[in-house]
Amino acid sequence: MGGWSSKPRKGMGTNLAVPNPLGFFPDHQLDPAFKANSDNPDWDLNPHKDNWPDANKVGVGAFGPGFTPPHGGLLGWSPQAQGLLTTVPAAPPPASTSRQSGRQPTPLSPPLRDTHPQAMQWNSTTFHQTLQDPRVRALYFPAGGSSSGTVSPAQNTVSAISSTLSKTGDPVPNMENISSGLLGPLLVLQAGFFLLTKILTIPQSLDSWWTSLNFLGQTPVCLGQNSQSQISSHSLTCCPPICPGYRWMCLRRFIIFLCILLLCLIFLLVLLDCQGMLPVCPLIPGSSTTSTGPCKTCTTPAQGTSMFPSCCCTKPTDGNCTCIPIPSSWAFAKFLWEWASVRFSWLSLLVPFVQWFVGLSPTVWLSVIWMMWFWGPSLCNILSPFMPLLPIFFCLWVYI
């Protein structure tokens, strides 16, 4: 069976008409698809065929006892695949030559020109020449695009890529700046939430103070709990909706909200008047009407930039025009004082006393200290509900 012979072939696999593609029969060659050619069509008579010496062995294989596929089992040539149990000794670990223990420092990475020399050869010129290829240019400029030989966007892109690759690395972001940038809004949010919670307690505190005036020296008790409705004992400022005193509690808090709003508006008005943003014409003695018609020369803006007039003009009945400049600050306060002085003549008698009292600064300070010492505890109890409004007034004073 090892060479060419004219003797009739014997044994299994002699019938060439029987297909044997996987070669599971002894003394038969594999499928011609593995080594097929037109010169050796007769694979059973091929002198270079594989005689499969392992195919005649009888042993426990991957396909059961007494049958082992040629060229090893489907699981391979390993002893475990052939059904033989063997113990492979584990290779001992290599002996360490370093006496140091623990984590060693990471060695420095070699430069790019040593590890990837091909990357250093890919410069901008090579990249630009590659872009001249029609197949590559078609990716950047589809049908209907530019057909010129030079690709202008590619040069800009290459310059940007080259400038990016020329850097050794981007700088590490400063974590201190990032934390400070996040800390500011968080502090503002926390302060705003704190002020909001305190402001919401103002109506309840003022309501307690209001109701305590009716129970001097006693604990305020809601009178609605003594009615026919079965209501548990509660404070006068926390009436449930089924309590008859609930409507009065809502009315008191509504009035308190209006008073707080009025207080904020008064503070804003004083602030605007102090900065001269309320151009109110003062009262002129003996004037009946105020007009800006025939006296436009007197109503020119102050310093040429202000949108408010710098003076007021009056037009009496005889037709003569009188102009008085508007105060740069406290115009509205002076207007109110003049108006009150006209209505109440006795207020003019207080002007010298107020001027004398203000002129005595040590006396004024001593008086203020004495009043705070005497009435301090009572004033603190009265003004404590309004303390959360002080930061709001301060912010308005600074930013307006």
From Swiss-Prot:
Carbohydrate-modified residues: 320
Subcellular localization: Virion membrane
Residue spans, topological domain Virion surface: 2-181, 275-348, 399-400
Record's comment on post-translational modification: Isoform M is N-terminally acetylated by host at a ratio of 90%, and N-glycosylated by host at the pre-S2 region.
Lipidation (N-myristoyl glycine): 2
Keyword entries, A-Z: Acetylation, Caveolin-mediated endocytosis of virus by host, Fusion of virus membrane with host endosomal membrane, Fusion of virus membrane with host membrane, Glycoprotein, Host-virus interaction, Lipoprotein, Membrane, Myristate, Transmembrane, Transmembrane helix, Viral attachment to host cell, Viral envelope protein, Viral penetration into host cytoplasm, Virion, Virus endocytosis by host, Virus entry into host cell
Pfam families: vMSA
Intravirion topological domain: 2-253, 203-253, 370-375
Amino-acid biosynthesis as UniProt keyword: no
Subunit-level organization: Interacts (via its myristoylated pre-S1 region) with the host SLC10A1/NTCP; this interaction is essential for viral entry.
Protein name according to UniProt: Large envelope protein
Organism: Hepatitis B virus genotype B2 (isolate Vietnam/9873/1997) (HBV-B)
